[in-house]
Swiss-Prot record:
Subcellular location: Cytoplasm
Catalytic activity, EC: 2.7.2.8
Residue intervals passing through the bilayer: none
A GO MF term: ATP binding
Enzyme class: transferase
Gene Ontology CC terms, in alphabetical order: cytoplasm
Described purpose of this protein according to its UniProt entry: Catalyzes the ATP-dependent phosphorylation of N-acetyl-L-glutamate.
One biological process term in Gene Ontology: L-arginine biosynthetic process
Listed name of the protein: Acetylglutamate kinase
Family: Belongs to the acetylglutamate kinase family. ArgB subfamily.
ATP-binding as UniProt keyword: yes
Catalytic activity: N-acetyl-L-glutamate + ATP = N-acetyl-L-glutamyl 5-phosphate + ADP
Length: 292
């Protein structure tokens, strides 16, 4: 009997959040181990479909780094990286677009639909969804001066066509976006998926930006989870090197989205089943909540 009461209490705990977020938009960056483990893929799909059934508009932006690496290796193309950014020449961009748009995007859409969703796959070229420009990478030269170098078809989002996303949402569809942007001349750009998610969330004035990662969330120097943090506190933790490495661009992406109007950002562990529901509909959550 107790386990039944516990289930009822869990449902009651979720009730105020369901009421608060119905009709709002969540932008979720889907990536990491959650995209490769079959059990986690099913869990994520069910979480997203649950959000939609509760009246929450979920917009998915997915990554695909491992799949890109595997395909480039198969084609014998060696990648060069500058400060973590893939140098993307024309040949590499063709492979990136093929993998993200033609393979990964369709896999995510198919999985959501298989589990009862109405997902529609998009990339930045569809309806000029992600109008983009070339991103120049800053590096420090031998003389200590900051230089900007061209790393090919790597871009940043200039404008998001929210009309297309809103039209799909109103029809009950789940937009699934591949992080490939389009330039003014129709050229394709490879864009960091976290950045795309942040820009889309800001353009939609989203309630939440949620990044699925392969860590529990933002950790302190003792490797303990920080459950709640403000942007100001986050910058201090970067300065004292509590936050380092690959987590820095993720928290910076969240900070930019918050400054541009997103209400809250969350960095959560995508390796945990139903991580999205546990973060949103429980009082404690399972990851890090970032506020302005």
């Amino acid at each position: 009997m107790k386990h039944l009461i516990d289930k009822a209490n869990t449902l009651m705990e979720a009730l105020p959040y369901i009421r608060r977020f119905s009709g709002r938009t969540f932008v979720i960056k889907y990536g990491g181990h959650a995209m490769s483990d079959e059990r986690l893929k099913e869990s994520f799909a069910l979480d997203v479909i649950m959000l939609k059934s509760l009246g929450i508009n979920a917009v998915i932006v997915h990554g695909g780094g491992p799949q890109i690496n595997e395909t480039l290796k198969r084609y014998g193309i060696v990648s060069e990286f500058v400060r973590g950014m893939r140098v993307t020449d024309g040949e590499t961009m063709s492979v990136v677009e093929m993998v993200l748009v033609g393979q990964v995007n369709k896999e995510v859409v198919g999985y959501l639909n298989q589990h009862g969703g109405k997902a529609v796959g998009l990339c930045g070229k569809d309806g000029s969804l992600l109008l983009s420009k070339k991103l120049l990478q800053e590096v420090t030269g031998e003389d200590g001066a900051i230089e900007q170098i061209d790393i090919g078809y790597v871009g940043d989002v200039v404008k998001v066509n929210t009309d297309l996303i809103k039209t799909l949402e109103q029809g009950g569809y789940l937009p699934v976006i591949a992080p490939v942007g389009v330039g003014l001349a129709g050229e394709s750009y490879n864009i960091n998926a976290d950045v795309v998610a942040g820009r889309v969330a800001a353009a939609l004035n989203a309630e939440k930006l949620i990044l699925l990662t392969d860590t529990p969330g933002v950790l302190d120097k003792d490797k303990q989870l920080i459950q709640k943090i403000s942007v100001a506190q986050m910058h201090r933790l970067i300065e004292d090197e509590s936050i380092t490495g690959g987590m820095i661009p993720k928290v910076v992406c969240c900070a930019e989205a918050l400054n541009d109007g997103v209400k809250k950002a969350h960095i959560i562990d995508g390796r945990m089943e139903h991580s999205v529901l546990l973060e949103i509909f429980t009082d404690v959550g399972i990851g890090t909540e970032i506020t302005k």
